[in-house]
Amino acid sequence: MYMYEEERNNINNNQEGLRLEMAFPQHGFMFQQLHEDNAHHLPSPTSLPSCPPHLFYGGGGNYMMNRSMSFTGVSDHHHLTQKSPTTTNNMNDQDQVGEEDNLSDDGSHMMLGEKKKRLNLEQVRALEKSFELGNKLEPERKMQLAKALGLQPRQIAIWFQNRRARWKTKQLERDYDSLKKQFDVLKSDNDSLLAHNKKLHAELVALKKHDRKESAKIKREFAEASWSNNGSTENNHNNNSSDANHVSMIKDLFPSSIRSATATTTSTHIDHQIVQDQDQGFCNMFNGIDETTSASYWAWPDQQQQHHNHHQFN
């Protein structure tokens, strides 16, 4: 029974060894094709160090894998060198973009693990003066500045780009401040106008109330005056009517008295006329009046009596 188990273990070990040999062939066989393709790049297989047998059992995998990766990198480099010119140019452009990415904000070139190379004060002043002349960088001016300042054209372009971005930011800040000041002034004016409008509205409401009160007062006074005028007119009319009634009643009751009053009034008028005629008669006495005139003069009482009688009949 023990012998049987030992033989089975030996068989298993042999099978395991075969599998490992198939998985990790010898280095001569493994790199034969690679040697044929890259004869001028790779050393001969005989120059490679031999792989110890113990590496095939328990730890040889990592070693072979590392060697395989190293030679694979060499092969990739060989294939990249044999690509078309267009691909090479594209890669050069990408390299330039990568180099531009390594540039700092002020245009200085940064290598991997290298500190920023800042521009000196004179270079910055010269670039500032050039930027004041024009914020857009032309190719000719870029080359002139690069030669004059001892910088690369790419550094000049990046510095102008960053400086233009800062200038736009400052310009926006100035515009914002100016607009904010204008807004504050307009807001203040608007607030004052609103307050003045509110004050005027309050005054208008007060004037309307006062006007309504005055109108009501005037209407009330006018109504009272109308009532008083109507009352006085009616009283005057009543008084006039009563006076007329009284006169008519007196005429009806005393007609002879009224006629005697009328005759008295007429005689008074005649007496006044006689006095005037007497004055004229006395004046004519001294002017040589004749008998006819004197006769007519002395006959006046008869005529006066007739005239008096005529008025009585009327």
Curated annotation (Swiss-Prot):
Residues 82-95 have a biased composition (Polar residues). Expressed predominantly in flowers, and in the cortex of the root and the stem. Residues 112-171 bind DNA. GO terms for molecular function: DNA binding; DNA-binding transcription factor activity; DNA-binding transcription factor activity, RNA polymerase II-specific; sequence-specific DNA binding. Residues 77-109 are annotated as: Disordered. It comes from the Eukaryota. Keywords: DNA-binding, Homeobox, Nucleus, Transcription, Transcription regulation. It is found in: Nucleus. InterPro entries: HD (IPR001356), HDZip_class_I_plant (IPR045224), Homeobox_CS (IPR017970), Homeodomain-like_sf (IPR009057), HTH_motif (IPR000047), Leu_zip_homeo (IPR003106). Residues 172-207 are annotated as: Leucine-zipper. One of its GO terms (cellular component) is nucleus. Probable transcription factor. Belongs to the HD-ZIP homeobox family. Class I subfamily. This is Homeobox-leucine zipper protein HAT7. It comes from Arabidopsis thaliana (Mouse-ear cress). The lineage of its organism: Eukaryota, Viridiplantae, Streptophyta, Embryophyta, Tracheophyta. The gene is HAT7.
